[in-house]
Amino acid sequence: MKWIHVNARFEADDMALAEELVAQIFFDLDLKGVVCEVPLPEPDEGFGSNALAQPDTHSISGYLPDLSTSDLLFADIKKKADALKGINVTLSTRIVDDQDWAESWKDFFFVTRITDTLVIRPSWREFEPKPGDVVIDLDPGMAFGTGTHETTAMCLALVQEQITPGASFLDVGTGSGILMIAAAKLGAGTLKGLDNDEAAVQIAGKNLEHNRISPQSFEIRCTTLDRYPHEKFDLVVANILAEVIISILPEIHSRLAPGGRAILSGIIIAWEERVKTALEDNGFTLVKTTTQGEWVALVAELV
């Protein structure tokens, strides 16, 4: 079978929001292999001899099967993209073979050093760890969270900064499980996560096991936080949309142990003050703010 590679380059005043909206079109129309491409520096030397140049513009790409209905589906993509207010989207297509598609998406993923010692390694990239490196083995999949997005990268760095040996850890919106993997390798004790997507729960579990984390040492449930058992945790992490974070702050508050902290990411800068106000209204004290690109991550503790 042949596939149609669809690429959407976009420009907007709020690039973070534009990225979300354009990507949502691709997901809604069930494109395969969706990748968000953002301008980044060239990979560091030693991050894989096969590494290619990083993209120089913001774009979203995905794949459609080359069928009789493909023209109609592409027209639907264009219609939805043209309807986005304040976002200039340029679409392009090319035909690729099955084998080309199976390998081409790998071009966009590299070994990524998140901090001085925290590293994410895709299976097809060569990498020699330095002494003291904590390496997360993770291949991009269906679930959100590969470490390449600013929100995940900030979360990982903050987990490394905030985790203490033996700490109890809860990941709200587990996605790929990358934050749970990091917490486990950084010394967390109790390790739990939840996601409302059953596919993500299954993927996360496999990713943890791939990183040699025993299934007996973690638990991931397909549920929402309001339905999750009322346990107490030393560190609760939520890398999700800002409006969702605001809505679940009372639940996060009730899940924190005395002295516990929450790491909140997935917050577009335009929502920063609203989230901070909601934290104060829900009995939190802001401990730290960090920014990367158009995104903000916060650390808060109980008053």
From Swiss-Prot:
Q: Does the keyword Cytoplasm apply?
A: yes
Keywords, A to Z?
Cytoplasm, Methyltransferase, S-adenosyl-L-methionine, Transferase
Q: List, alphabetically, the InterPro entries matched.
A: Ribosomal_L11_MeTrfase_PrmA, Ribosomal_PrmA_MeTrfase, SAM-dependent_MTases_sf
Any Pfam family the entry gives: PrmA
Q: Which reaction does it catalyse?
A: L-lysyl-[protein] + 3 S-adenosyl-L-methionine = N(6),N(6),N(6)-trimethyl-L-lysyl-[protein] + 3 S-adenosyl-L-homocysteine + 3 H(+)
Please, one GO biological process term? methylation
CDD domains given in the database record = AdoMet_MTases
Any GO MF annotation of the entry: protein-lysine N-methyltransferase activity
So which domain of life are we looking at?
A: Bacteria
Q: What is its EC number?
A: 2.1.1.-
- Localisation: Cytoplasm
Binding-site residues, S-adenosyl-L-methionine: T152, G173, D195, N239
Q: Looking at the UniProt record for this protein, which Gene Ontology cellular component terms does it annotate, in alphabetical order?
A: cytoplasm
The family annotation for this protein states:
Belongs to the methyltransferase superfamily. PrmA family.
Q: What does this protein do?
A: Methylates ribosomal protein L11.
NCBIfam families (alphabetical): prmA
Q: Which protein, by its recorded name, is this?
A: Ribosomal protein L11 methyltransferase
Organism listed in the record: Desulforapulum autotrophicum (strain ATCC 43914 / DSM 3382 / VKM B-1955 / HRM2)
